[in-house]
């Protein structure tokens, strides 16, 4: 459980945590990342279903669980691929599995804050939405800070180079998502075309 315990150390000692993560490369295991992912999905569902309605804007019955899971998994996967690709081009030292692990550790602030924010939302009304949004934004900034630290420390980059890598990674991630959406649209059109051909063939052969 050593690597899993690093997830909690990342809150207080992010630099040391990411150094320890890379130093334990020979003892690498994926299960801490899987556990963190499951925790992330769990707290996200709690947040979505139990957030106070005036702040949530949507009711629980309107939530598409599958879509919400995909909205977490796809960006995490795309970011891991993007940041690894860019750091590799920029002479980074991180392996892909370490990029995945660092990405998951960077989500720890959300794992820690989602449920407290959900509980706190029941003390807030719609007039307190700005304050709630500030707390949520602070959590997102915290995640961004951990991502920056992980890239800088684990690849031995300067701050300037790290910022450049992050910008390029975001652009590459956007490209991946755009290509993915294009492929999905093409696959959908192809499916509809094939289904139409089959329907026409059935009608021509059987009249139904």
Features from the language model and the residues they span:
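Short, Lys/Arg-enriched, disordered terminal segments
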Residues: 1-8, 196, 207-208
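Selected alpha-helical membrane-embedding segments in polytopic membrane proteins
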Residues: 2-97
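Solvent-exposed, non-transmembrane amphipathic alpha-helical segments
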Residues: 27-28, 34, 38-41, 101-106, ...
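Membrane-helix interface segments in multi-pass membrane proteins
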Residues: 44-72, 117-140, 177-208
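Hydrophobic alpha-helical transmembrane segments and adjacent short intramembrane/lumenal linkers
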Residues: 83-84, 88-178
């Amino acid at each position: 459980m050593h690597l899993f315990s690093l997830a909690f150390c990342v809150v207080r000692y992010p630099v040391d945590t990411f150094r320890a993560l890379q130093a334990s490369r020979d003892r690498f295991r994926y299960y801490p990342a899987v556990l963190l992912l499951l925790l992330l999905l769990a707290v996200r569902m709690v947040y979505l279903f139990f957030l106070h309605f005036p702040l949530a804007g949507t009711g629980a019955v309107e939530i598409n669980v599958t879509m919400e899971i995909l909205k977490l998994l796809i960006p995490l996967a795309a970011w891991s691929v993007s940041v690894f690709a860019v750091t590799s081009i920029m002479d980074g030292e991180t392996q892909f599995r370490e990029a995945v692990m660092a990405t998951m550790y960077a989500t720890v602030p959300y794992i820690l804050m989602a449920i407290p924010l959900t509980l706190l939302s029941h003390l807030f009304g719609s007039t307190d939405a700005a304050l709630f949004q500030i707390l949520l934004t602070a959590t997102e900034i915290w995640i961004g800070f951990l991502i920056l630290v992980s890239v800088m420390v684990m690849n031995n980059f300067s701050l300037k180079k790290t910022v450049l890598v992050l910008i390029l990674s975001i652009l590459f991630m956007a490209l991946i998502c755009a290509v993915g959406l294009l492929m999905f649209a093409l696959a959908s059109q192809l499916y509809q075309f094939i289904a139409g051909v089959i329907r026409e063939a059935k009608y021509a052969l059987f009249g139904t």
